[in-house]
Amino acid sequence: RSEDPQDAGAAGRLRVVAPSWHEALSCALSTAGQIAFTGNTRDLFPVLRSGGCRFLPFEDCLREALAARGIAGLVRHDPVDGLSLSPPHEPALGEALAARGIRLGQGGAGPQGLRAALPRLLGEPEAPLAVLLDYASRLVQGDPGARDALLVAIDKAVRGPAPRRTRAHADAPRRNPLIWMLDTPGDLPEWFAVGNETLSHISVPMPDLEERFGFAGELSGTFSDVLAMDARELAARLEEFALEADGMTLSGMRTVAAFAEAEGHGLAGIAEAIRTWRIGTRRNPWKSSLMRARVARGREMLAARVQGQDDAIDRTMAILERSVMGLSGAQIRSRHARPRGLLFFAG
């Protein structure tokens, strides 16, 4: 998708769609017993419902995508809290797990508890479910032998017999999938990941222009100055927010929106708020009186160092003066409105 509003269309026509990793997940559920997610997994994502679009954390968005494939239950595990059922869930699922001797809570937090529970979870016949290993890069620390033993147990569980589906769950994937949430793809050892046909890798990208624009609209209620804007100005400001937030997560946009309102920038000053958030200071060096004074003396300073190149000095001073005085856009708050390029000095 293009990041240029000229290509993407007017702000009012931008449309948020389901995250791109949804389609990759749907395919992987049909072909792989385990799926490894890396990338921007700690962000917010659009969830499309009949009442509109909501932006939810990854786990909630994952649960919606699994439900669309007939997987109603999500059992999550992390090294601190152990096994738990991701809400909302059917009460019957918790009862079925208890009947199979699967301990929820901190009792299943360690590698031994996970090793004991996984074969029963992945072979659960009563209802299709998925197992999410959150913070999977931290499952076993400091003991390569224990880590390898756990991975071998996981591999055996994934390759074990698939549960027998009842007719009511015939549309669900044949296997209960195991889902990894990793910091980086290299967190799984090479011997386990390379050539493993049961493992599918999915990288979650940063939000694109449409997602940022849609979330900017979601955040518009944060700003008090939107009450004085008409529809055209509001759309332009939201588009500016989306463009300025290029490279940011949606969670970062939410943080910046709260910062902009607290600092008195409002939506109209969102570009300045983002500039401050990116560089970590309110100071703008292009507004410095000392900088302007140095540019005013720039010809004298350059002429003392560069001999016989008056034309080069003239052109250099023109660029610097336009940058500082506001004619080139180099000091403009808006990043996407600035000219881009480099000035090389050679000789």
For the regions a language model picked out, list residue spans one by one.
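AAA+ P-loop ATPase motor domain of ring mechanoenzymes
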Residues: 2-21, 25, 29-37, 83-87, ...
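Alpha-helix termini
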Residues: 121-124, 160-171, 223-228, 326-334
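Sensor-1/coupling segment of RecA-like P-loop NTPase cores
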Residues: 154-191
